[in-house]
A protein has these predicted regions:
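Acidic/histidine-rich catalytic neighborhood of metal-dependent amide-processing enzymes
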Residues: 111-179
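Acidic/His- and Gly-rich active-site-bordering loop/insert found
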Residues: 1-106, 131
Length: 180
């Protein structure tokens, strides 16, 4: 597997079901805490400045920041860390497996695959020459329920452009209604 696929497998193995939904056994999901800690460690290990943005008790957004040549410009890469319930899945939700070249597990498509790709993109930017604009990776909470993570993000962060890692059947979408 590639480094991005390896990262995706790690993320899928972490149960980050939104607390509004049941996880395995019917208890409320644990939320994004373990994914947030893993993302913070990934960024820190690569020397990327990290900011923890508290949103709810025990639930925080994680921001990774690569400075750009023009500090007045900013691009945000946004992906959420929570998933929906694994109820009804016919495979083990937190045991990632590759079949026919595709990695399967809860959150692989929505949206831990996008998060893994963005983490590696930011890591690549961090070791090269400074990009034209500051690049901020925003790993946010609560997209699957009430959008409280991205709502907090936009209260405190202005961006000239944003790339949101939501599945779109591989169609580029240049604008849509929403929070970001």
């Amino acid at each position: 597997m590639t480094a991005v696929a390896d990262t995706l497998a790690v993320l899928v193995a972490i149960d980050s079901v939104n607390p509004a939904y049941p996880t395995l056994g019917g208890a409320p999901g644990p939320g994004e805490g373990a994914v947030a800690a893993w993302v913070e460690q990934f960024l820190g290990d690569r020397g990327i400045r990290t900011v923890i943005q508290p949103v709810l008790p025990g639930r925080s957004n994680v921001l990774g920041i690569v400075p750009g040549r023009d500090p007045a410009r900013r691009v945000v890469l946004e992906a959420h860390m929570d998933t929906v319930s694994p109820a009804g899945m016919t495979i083990a939700p937190f045991a990632p497996r590759v079949e026919a070249g595709r990695l399967h597990g809860r959150g692989a498509c929505d949206v831990k695959g996008g998060l893994a790709a963005m983490l590696h993109a930011l890591a690549d930017l961090a070791v090269g020459p400074p990009p034209p604009a500051e690049v901020v990776l925003a790993a946010v909470i609560d997209e699957e329920h009430a959008f409280r993570g991205v709502s907090r993000l936009v209260e405190h962060l202005r961006a000239d452009r944003a790339v949101v890692a939501e599945p779109t059947d591989l169609r580029i979408v240049t604008a849509t209604k929403g929070v970001l």
